[in-house]
Amino acid sequence: MTSFGIIVFPGSNCDRDIATVTAGLLDQPTRFIWHQETDLHGVDVVVLPGGFSYGDYLRCGAIARFSPIMTAIIDHANAGKRVLGICNGFQVLTEVGLLPGALIRNRDLHFICDRVTVRVESNQTVWTKGYQSQQVITLPIAHGEGRYFADGDTLKALEDNEQILFRYSNAQGELTTDSNPNGSLHNIAGITNVQGNVLGMMPHPERAADRLLKATDGLAMFIS
């Protein structure tokens, strides 16, 4: 059994979607953790869900990084335990420094709600062992500030350390401008920390995990 702790900030709106997968579909112990709590006792995997934490005031994730629960999340990550940030959760992880870079306004400055094809770069991680390396999967996206940006040295380190776990691609797995929905540098859709236990991604695997929706490409993320 894997115990999931789903962080709930003011403005989170994908927390119950994740619980539907972890508790409803997979029957794993799951609890909601309000952002003012300070204890992650008994939690194996921390999930920071999508949404608009604190209304995205100042900058996406900029206020959530100061929530009391973040100290415990940082300790959890530094202990080598798993932390997953999806969409707004990814933004929070960059703001708090658990992942490098930043998520900025989409290339066309519009909110994007669509399904995209994403290439799994490696299956040699705890998050992707249920996939094949270079496998192309389809996942939903819904964001206005999902364009990954980092300086040249950071991008080189991400490439050299194989921290880029997901890239936007076409159905054949080719990295093209047309298949990059938001202008992310290096077609980045998701990255890990150097140790590989912290993952941030803009696509929503929890929205592609139920056979009733005829979309299950994201389910392996939660089984891994």
Swiss-Prot record:
Its main location: cytoplasm. Gene3D superfamilies: 3.40.50.880. Disulfide bonds: none annotated. CDD domains: GATase1_FGAR_AT. GO terms for molecular function: ATP binding; glutaminase activity; phosphoribosylformylglycinamidine synthase activity. Keywords: ATP-binding, Cytoplasm, Glutamine amidotransferase, Hydrolase, Ligase, Nucleotide-binding, Purine biosynthesis. The keyword Ligase applies. This is Phosphoribosylformylglycinamidine synthase subunit PurQ. Part of the phosphoribosylformylglycinamidine synthase complex involved in the purines biosynthetic pathway. Catalyzes the ATP-dependent conversion of formylglycinamide ribonucleotide (FGAR) and glutamine to yield formylglycinamidine ribonucleotide (FGAM) and glutamate. The FGAM synthase complex is composed of three subunits. PurQ produces an ammonia molecule by converting glutamine to glutamate. PurL transfers the ammonia molecule to FGAR to form FGAM in an ATP-dependent manner. Part of the FGAM synthase complex composed of 1 PurL, 1 PurQ and 2 PurS subunits. The active site is at residues 87, 204, 206.
